[in-house]
Amino acid sequence: MPPTPMSPLDAWLHSHQAGGSLCMTFGLVARFVGEPPALDALRDRAAHRWAHHDRLRMSSGTGLRWIPGPPFDPVHHVGTPTRRASPDEHTAHLIARPFGPPRPPWQLHLLPGPDGGFALLLRAHHALLDGRSALVLVQELLDGPTALPGQRAGSQAPPRRRPGLTDLLPGGRPLPFHGPVDSRRAVAWSAVTAGELTAARDALPSGRASANAVFLAATAGALRGAGATGRLPFLPGVCAMVPVDVRPDDDGALLGNHYATVRVPLPSHGRARRRLAAVDRFTRRVALHERARAQARAVAGMAGRRGALTEALGRYVDSSLYSSLLCSSLADRGGPRTLGPAALTGLALLPSLSPGHPLAVTMVRDATGAATLTVVTDHARRVLAGRLSALLREEVRALGP
């Protein structure tokens, strides 16, 4: 297989790290209760279950091309840390470590934990995989039902280009936490039960809100509660950059970067249910999948057109004028999952940070309907990570009865 040019999205993500501005490593953590597997057994399992993925054999070298290689070496790509630390400490350390050539930029780490538990951390360069790809790989690694495809917009009508371009207009404002991103990471998470999330979704008299609407409304409230929206929190201009999956309807397990981002205004209302109502109205009114697919088509049309204009557009998308923070969500729609005798208890998505944006928030729902809310910041904002994580859980609970 000959080398292939990176897609425009892959190349843009690759350029962030190649230019020396940021580490573009992201991760997905799977937490378990039970006996951890032997390292050799985990390596054998990964080599067997992921052997069919050509994407895991790709390396980038020093250019903007994917270079195929032999089947991945499980001894290199699957390991466990040698130093003693908690799973949380290992996770924060590992997602701050950049990948470099010549090997494919991904690794799976077995992280021993206290009280008979453990975690797996799948981390990768964002140019190679996106969050959905990481979830697919973890689902394939574990034992359990086949994952159900995510809900996607119908494909009867071709996507329109205009909504995607409209979404590029300025809509954000600088916030107190914006600024240069340092080289270390802080991670904090909190858990929301299925009952709490269901009660929050049923909080509006107008009808059931989506789980994502609850997540975004909770983020708006947590930012306000932490003082992260400035001295005048009622001002507009706080926007979430929301990745939307644009994979074909019949290929939800496709690896790589197959998403586009859509901005969702985060309301400044002082009351939790008013914030949820505002987000719910926006997400119902705006065709998010159609807009995302239109934007994906526009980005794909830039292939081979790198120049001053595309570089300026990339810098703008990274700026606080475009969006305030990343808010990404995933859902594991399969049934209970296990790794040998150990049961999966939760998943957490740990995104890479973009230039000038030292804060990102994610939600991952499991098959029971429970969710893990995760905050990733750079080291300088580590206090904000812990504060927002606690506030996110409080905001979801506040929406219930």
Task: Give the positions of each predicted feature.
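Generic N-terminal amphipathic, Lys/Arg-enriched alpha-helix
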Residues: 23-29
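Soluble acyl-CoA-dependent acyltransferase catalytic core bearing the H(X)4D motif
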Residues: 1-9, 29-51, 55-355, 364-368, ...
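Glycine-rich, small/acidic residue-mixed loop/short-helix segments
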Residues: 356-358, 393-394
